[in-house]
């Protein structure tokens, strides 16, 4: 029998009140705040038709966070080209960065999770925390407006923004991809050099990234490591897109075509 912790015994209203206290704001609609804290596994287990999971709010919150972070990066780095700003934003708004912010609130103990998710350590999973954080920002936007959401970005993303603005926030995309691929797909990324071009002192390497049996991304770089990091970054972004809007089987899943 699983022993319940203090976090598991909290009522829904207590969770919302604690969230309000930690964020320093009040939600005009408690049900919206509670939705942000509700994982899909909890809804599946309770089978309450009135209960909603946080996936739609996560979808909205992703855009809210990206907008606010983009605005702050433009203000911090005047004159920086669009491509560089995009790369900087990706070093802030990713599963690792979002989970880091969620832990500073902290958010994990407030989440409503199914028993299976609880037993597998869901309160500390980067994927669960990152999704919940975006859902909270979606709820803040709906109930308090964009200004309130931007104020929270200024407070909680300040360290990450400082790091990338000063050039320190270079994330290891290969490690992040390895963790995500193992957690979500039970697959191990594999890299292989497809081609080398250019003179010996200035070679360009093209690397292909495989997930399962699928060639998932290609990227180039001045070194194998640089090319692998770029391929891993592109794959991470695609996996996040697929998770937000699943329209096909996960990459690496064997295809079973129906005979004509």
Curated annotation (Swiss-Prot):
InterPro entries hit by this protein: dsRBD_dom, RNase_III, RNase_III_dom, RNase_III_sf
Function, as annotated: Digests double-stranded RNA. Involved in the processing of primary rRNA transcript to yield the immediate precursors to the large and small rRNAs (23S and 16S). Processes some mRNAs, and tRNAs when they are encoded in the rRNA operon. Processes pre-crRNA and tracrRNA of type II CRISPR loci if present in the organism.
Positions of Mg(2+) binding: 58, 131, 134
Subcellular compartments: Cytoplasm
Native organism: Myxococcus xanthus (strain DK1622)
Enzyme active site: 62, 134
The protein's enzyme class: hydrolase
GO CC aspect terms: cytoplasm
Name this polypeptide is given: Ribonuclease 3
Keywords assigned: Cytoplasm, Endonuclease, Hydrolase, Magnesium, Metal-binding, mRNA processing, Nuclease, RNA-binding, rRNA processing, rRNA-binding, tRNA processing
Annotated transmembrane regions: none
Organism taxonomic ancestry: Bacteria, Pseudomonadati, Myxococcota, Myxococcia, Myxococcales
Gene Ontology terms for molecular function: double-stranded RNA binding; metal ion binding; ribonuclease III activity; rRNA binding
KW RNA-binding (keyword) present: yes
Alphabetical list of Gene3D superfamilies matching this protein: 3.30.160.20, Ribonuclease III domain
Subunit structure: Homodimer.
Region (Disordered): 219-260
Cofactor(s) the protein needs: Mg(2+)
SUPFAM superfamilies: dsRNA-binding domain-like (SSF54768), RNase III domain-like (SSF69065)
Record domain RNase III: where: 16-145
Domain of life: Bacteria
């Amino acid at each position: 029998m699983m022993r319940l912790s203090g976090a598991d015994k909290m009522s829904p209203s207590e969770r919302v009140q604690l969230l309000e206290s930690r964020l320093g704001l009040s939600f005009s609609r408690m049900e919206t705040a509670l939705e942000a804290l509700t994982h899909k596994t909890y809804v599946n287990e309770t089978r309450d038709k009135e209960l909603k999971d946080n996936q739609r709010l996560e979808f909205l919150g992703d855009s809210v966070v990206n907008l606010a972070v983009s605005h702050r990066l433009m203000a911090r780095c005047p004159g920086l080209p669009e491509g560089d700003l995009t790369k900087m934003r990706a070093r802030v708004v990713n599963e690792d960065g979002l989970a880091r912010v969620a832990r500073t609130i902290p958010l994990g103990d407030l989440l409503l999770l199914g028993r299976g998710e609880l037993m597998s350590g869901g309160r500390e999973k980067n994927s669960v925390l990152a999704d919940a954080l975006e859902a909270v920002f979606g709820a803040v936007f709906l109930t308090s407006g964009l200004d309130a959401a931007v104020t929270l970005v200024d407070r909680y993303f300040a360290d990450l923004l400082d790091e990338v603005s000063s050039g320190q926030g270079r994330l290891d995309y290969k490690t992040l991809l390895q963790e995500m691929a193992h957690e979500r797909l039970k697959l191990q990324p594999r890299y292989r050099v497809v081609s080398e071009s250019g003179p010996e002192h200035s070679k360009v390497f093209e690397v292909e990234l495989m997930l399962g049996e699928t060639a998932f991304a290609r990227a180039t770089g001045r070194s194998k490591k640089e090319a692998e990091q770029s391929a891993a970054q592109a794959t991470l972004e695609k996996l996040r897109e697929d998770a937000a809007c699943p329209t096909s089987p996960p990459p690496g899943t064997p295809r079973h075509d129906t005979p004509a």
